[in-house]
Amino acid sequence: MNKVPMTGEGFASLKEELRWRQQEERPRIIEAISEARSHGDLSENAEYHAAKEAQSLNEGRVNELEDLIARAEVIDVTKLSGDKVKFGATVVLVDEDTEEKKTYQIVGDQEADVKSGRISISSPIARALIGKEVGDAIEVNAPGGARGYEIVQVQFI
């Protein structure tokens, strides 16, 4: 069973989603099924079929969350240090073409959110960054073509 690296924040988020799905969403769906069942004939009852589908999707996600939580390897980023980029690092990059600064934290696949500056450890940019240090230049093949960046700061916060 492969371990899934994630930050403490990502782990807490998964546990909260699991709690919500089990303690709030599951009872709501059961109530919807019960309500739809009371309408009679199930063969042509769209509400019933929609509720059963919602139940299936919810239970599938519950199973997925339980698996991820069981395989989680929680990494306390605040206890990491060093000059090289690794999981959990917050990296400040400068685009070599536009001189625009970008800040990314390298996190687990499940907690990635580019809008929040959190990129997946398996993303092309994170893979290019791993093992590099301040002053190094990287090139990332992006959908719009290759982009060059220089690492200006690496921190573990």
Swiss-Prot record:
Superkingdom of this protein's organism: Bacteria
UniProt keyword Transcription present: yes
Keyword Transcription regulation annotated: yes
Signal peptide extent: none
An annotated Gene Ontology molecular function: RNA polymerase binding
PROSITE patterns in alphabetical order: GREAB_1, GREAB_2
Gene3D superfamilies documented for this protein: Transcription elongation factor, GreA/GreB, C-terminal domain, Transcription elongation factor, GreA/GreB, N-terminal domain
One GO term of the biological process aspect: DNA-templated transcription elongation
UniProt keyword terms in alphabetical order: DNA-binding, Transcription, Transcription regulation
Family: Belongs to the GreA/GreB family.
Annotated HAMAP family: GreA_GreB
Its job: Necessary for efficient RNA polymerase transcription elongation past template-encoded arresting sites. The arresting sites in DNA have the property of trapping a certain fraction of elongating RNA polymerases that pass through, resulting in locked ternary complexes. Cleavage of the nascent transcript by cleavage factors such as GreA or GreB allows the resumption of elongation from the new 3'terminus. GreA releases sequences of 2 to 3 nucleotides.
NCBIfam families: greA, PRK00226.1-2, PRK00226.1-4, PRK00226.1-5
Protein name: Transcription elongation factor GreA
